[in-house]
């Protein structure tokens, strides 16, 4: 082992657990095995190929040299930031305090650096996207959770209230990462009643100290309920405009534009014009990655000025939302046929199957060529990469794995 590596950096796994599972699945498939790979976190078509939105790539190919090569401003092109915020809240005239980031992960990382002190903890849902914990650890912070509602059940307001008040009491501030609507990894969104309860709790706790709500938006364009998504965004806008809770958003082009490799997004607080907040975000950018790629920012600006391209993109989003919905319906039907409960997907790329001993169940599934991602609460299943025709195999293999004790 390299002696120069400090002791606290010597015990990490060689690869991210999700990427390691995906690599194992691909290796076994390449070796001739029949593999069902539900670990994938990108949208695949029925042939198992990466979906790349043609409307977006048409704009990409049209970019000029000067839209690609120069440095972008440290905090990002202001017009890009405004255009990205207005994709989510069209009536807003400004991005507020905002900066460009390398994808949504960059936005999450910057929020930790600016809204918590080292040693403090952020709050998020259980279950959550695994790299949340990695981001917290890398910034010297902890992570605590409150429960995401079960299918058909309301938000556990008492548990959320206790978590919020505990953090406020112990550290004097709260940062909540909320992946809603289209929650990763459950594929379900908060109901209007759930949101009302949670926002009420946030308002109450904000009387005791600073509260920041960061909405982690990644999958909003892939939903069977676009009207519900719009209603949720309006509710969060109302909370942000009140000003008692600092409401921001982690925005990304990765899924929405299928520009995973462009690594472009933003951290935006549309209802804040605080110059100190803007200066802090800009400082973090300069001290972390300096600035972000210009090309994807230029692409979004072209999109914002091209109504026909927007129509083509919306049509592609509708199509792939229908594909995901059909996969989710097929999976629910297959689970029911095997005597298990349906999962009631509403949006996003994933669903979560609640199981006892997730690691053990995941291992038994792998032995039969079915790959999932184990979580403390169960198994994350990527319907983004699983064809509807594969769902009966998945359900039957899962039933078999659960029958082993």
Task: Map each language-model feature to its residues.
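Conserved glycine-rich beta-strand-loop-beta hairpin in the small C-terminal domain of fold type I
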Residues: 314-335, 339-354, 374-377
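Short catalytic/ligand-binding loop motif for oxyanion handling, primarily in non-cytosolic enzymes
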Residues: 44-49, 184-187, 221-224, 257-260, ...
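N-terminal small-domain helix-loop-helix segment of the aminotransferase-like
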Residues: 2, 11-103, 405
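Conserved core of the PLP fold type I
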Residues: 64-209, 213, 220-241
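Conserved core segment of the aminotransferase class I/II
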Residues: 237-321
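Short hydrophobic/aromatic beta-strand micro-patches
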Residues: 268, 352-354, 382-384
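Short beta-strand
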Residues: 35-37, 73, 250, 341-346, ...
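PLP-dependent enzyme catalytic core of the Aspartate aminotransferase-like
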Residues: 86, 92, 164-170, 243, ...
